């Protein structure tokens, strides 16, 4: 059996309505505070915690490993519903679901099982790939170096979407010993990781897309992955999450406009009724 066939047998789908009904009450709670969070730029720590505790981050994990076994189309449907409640939240979780997808594509074995257990336990990922400053296009300055049987990670990243909410960060780096590009899975609860809420962009106001600083951050030996093994459809996956978010925004806009129009008393511009 090939690796691709192994993957095809994982998380092929479940009953969508039953799955979605697990999370819809949480989506409703998230929607209640979405406008206020956007206006006051309040990061959605609590809504993301609700989702983590409910197992939302493990919906793609196979049922036999404790997850929901959702297919990729079903994940997209859930993200659309979530985006209709608060579009910042699925964007903040985009890096998490990408890392889950990568582990789904990994070779079966104990290491993959460890990650599945972490996802089921509610642990989530942010991402830190982008660098600013003197870095050249296509290059990376952040490095991992062998140290005492582990790795030491050093570098600065920007646009670290979701990392401020996460237990782990998916960091794009380069090995100092041989120059190979790698992905380092870095635990955030350590002195060597500093996360700043300094995102000042026009959009994504509450996605936690600020600066991540790594200063001799400890990375376990098994948590550095050669970039050549990254799941091959990752670019399409990232764009798919964006499209799901946009679809949710459109759904919310349709809902809100319909509510406004339905509540109007004056329906014709030259009507003789008082203005509503």
Question: Positions of the model-derived regions?
Answer:
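A short core secondary-structure module
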Residues: 159-194
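Glycine-rich phosphate/pyrophosphate-binding beta-alpha loops
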Residues: 158-163, 238-242
């Amino acid at each position: 059996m090939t690796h691709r066939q192994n993957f095809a047998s994982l998380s092929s789908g479940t009953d969508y309505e039953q799955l979605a009904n697990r999370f819809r009450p949480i989506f409703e709670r998230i929607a209640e505070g979405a406008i206020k969070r956007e206006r006051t730029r309040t990061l959605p720590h609590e809504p993301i915690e609700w989702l983590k505790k409910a197992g939302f981050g493990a919906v793609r994990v196979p049922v036999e490993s404790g997850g929901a076994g959702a297919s990729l189309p079903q994940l997209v449907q859930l993200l659309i519903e979530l985006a209709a409640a608060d579009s910042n939240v699925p964007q903040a979780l985009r890096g998490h679901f990408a890392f889950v997808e990568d582990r789904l594509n990994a070779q079966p074995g104990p290491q993959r099982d460890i990650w599945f257990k972490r996802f089921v336990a509610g642990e989530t990922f942010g991402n830190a790939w982008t660098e600013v400053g003197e870095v050249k296009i296509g290059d990376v300055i952040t490095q991992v170096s062998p140290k005492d049987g582990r790795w030491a990670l050093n570098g600065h990243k920007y646009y670290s979407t979701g990392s401020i909410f996460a237990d782990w960060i998916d960091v794009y780096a380069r090995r100092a010993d041989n120059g190979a590009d790698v992905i380092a899975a870095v635990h955030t609860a350590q002195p060597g990781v500093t996360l700043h809420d300094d995102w000042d962009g026009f959009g994504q106001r509450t996605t936690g897309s600020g600066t991540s600083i790594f200063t001799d951050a400890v990375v376990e030996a098994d948590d550095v992955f050669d970039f050549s093994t990254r799941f091959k459809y990752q670019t399409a996956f990232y764009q798919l999450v964006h499209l799901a978010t946009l679809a949710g925004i459109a759904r919310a806009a349709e809902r809100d406009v319909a509510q406004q129009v339905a509540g109007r008393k004056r329906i014709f511009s030259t009507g003789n009724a008082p203005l509503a």
